[in-house]
Structures are given as C-alpha cells and as structure tokens.
Swiss-Prot record:
Its EC number is 5.3.3.2. Gene3D superfamilies: Nucleoside Triphosphate Pyrophosphohydrolase. The keyword Isomerase applies. Belongs to the IPP isomerase type 1 family. One of its GO terms (biological process) is dimethylallyl diphosphate biosynthetic process. Keywords: Chlorophyll biosynthesis, Isomerase, Isoprene biosynthesis, Photosynthesis. GO terms for molecular function: isopentenyl-diphosphate delta-isomerase activity. It catalyses: isopentenyl diphosphate = dimethylallyl diphosphate. SUPFAM superfamilies: Nudix. Pathway: Isoprenoid biosynthesis; dimethylallyl diphosphate biosynthesis; dimethylallyl diphosphate from isopentenyl diphosphate: step 1/1; Porphyrin-containing compound metabolism; chlorophyll biosynthesis. The gene is IPI2. This is Isopentenyl-diphosphate Delta-isomerase II. The active site is at C145, E207. Catalyzes the 1,3-allylic rearrangement of the homoallylic substrate isopentenyl (IPP) to its highly electrophilic allylic isomer, dimethylallyl diphosphate (DMAPP).
Amino acid sequence: MSLTSRLYKPRLFSLPSQHSFRALPILSPPLRSSCIPAPLSVRASLSTRSIATSIAMGEAAADAGMDAVQRRLMFDDECILVDEVDCVVGHESKYNCHLWEKIESGNMLHRAFTVFLFNSKFELLLQQRSATKVTFPLVWTNTCCSHPLYRESELIDENNLGVRNAAQRKLLDELGIPAEDVPVDEFTPVSRMLYKAPSDGKWGEHELDYLLFIVRDVGIHPNPDEVADIKYVNREQLKELLRKADAGEEGLKLSPWFRLVVDNFLPKWWDHVEKGTLSEAVDMKTIHNL
C-alpha cells in the first residue's frame, strides 16, 4: 500500500464496542534499531540558524496577533523531521512544521507523542487546549499532546527514551505535573500512528505520533497559556462527550488525533489498563496509517 498518509476528513463517529474493531491499514517498518537518528552535528551553524530565524520571523510578520508565549514556542522549538518509517531526516521550526502550505508542499512530517494518563480509578485525564493555541484552540483532547524536540535527551532511540523524556517535560509545562509523579520508566509506548489534519486554512498537523499510556495519581496545576480546562472521565462520560461533539452541542470539539485513537484503539486498550495487561497490547513495530 502507499506510505502516503491520508488527509483527515471530519466525519461522524460512534464509540466502537470493545469487540468491533475493524482491520486497519498499517505500515510495517524495519526494526527501530535500523533507523539511526541524524546526529546533532548536522545542525546548522549559529550564523546560518540566525539567518534562517530572521527569514522565518519575516514570514511570520502577518502573525502579529499571535500570543507571545505561543510565538516564542513556534520559533524556539525545533521539531524532529522523520520519514514514513520513523527514521530521522532532519529538523525544522515548529512554525514551519505546522504551516498547512508547507505541509502540503514539502516534507514536514515530524515526530510527536500523545499521552493517555489514567488515575487509580482508571479514569482518563482530558484537557481543553487554551484559546491562544495556534493549532486546534479550545478543542478537547487527551491528557497531553506535543513533540519531542531536536535535542540529545529527546533523540534517544533506545526503549523510546527520547519520546518518554519529552512527555515528562510537557506534562510539567502544560499541566504542572511534577516529574516525580510521572517517572519516565512508568510510560508505556503502546503503538504509533501517522496522520494528517488541517486546523484551519493556515495551520495543521502532519505527525508520526507515539501513543503513550501511564497509570498514576498525580498533582495537577494547569498552565493557562496551554490549558483552558481539565477533567477526568470514565467510559460513560467519554461516550457522552463524543455524543455532544458529534451533535455539535455546546460548541464542543475534539482533536482529530484523539478521535482517531478513540475510534480505532482506545476501548480495547482501556480494557488492558483496567486488567493490568497493557503490555499485551504493545506493538511498536507497526505504524498505523490513519
């Protein structure tokens, strides 16, 4: 099959029963050890970086209304560019990686992660993204969704440690969850998926997403620059949230990556979380092309 990811098209969904999963198109990449991350020595020189940043800032002049915190992150953060079998091919600013024009015309596929954090009652922590987020503002999504950055600690391929380090960092940044509440060894990378989704006419996502699960009772202190609201939900409460989103009630919207996971994987994986058998669901050799 083609390795080209399909454009996410919003449509009505219903939460599948735990026994109604359909076969999914998948990519079967080589073993992760065969994908050697691009060394940090390929970074541009400081002078080249300065020129590139100046050009990018000039291109972004029309975005003067962008929130200052989000603007800084857009230009300071460097995403990890990958190919469709998750081999590192370079790095690019978060700004360029999320411009829909560049996504459609060039290789802006980048590595990402999405965290599903459950408490000891097996309730899932959701967040509503802040109104100032550049992509998908005010949508409800799973616990934390972001990117590992092009830095040594987040490029570590062995045991997916780089991605787990990034998840710990962003749980603190977005939700104020202390690192000691979410030890990196407690994250379970369950699988990976590749998807593309527009946010509006200008911004969008094209990600190779690591799906990370963790069961911990944590302290939460949301960062208002990142998060508008939070809630824990059980299965029935999630079904009601999906119903409202499908019906367009209360202006409620869900992120496309969260919806893809809900409709394709979450009920079965939630079963494993409750039974303490999540390791049986792990498949990190497959990339689901959704």
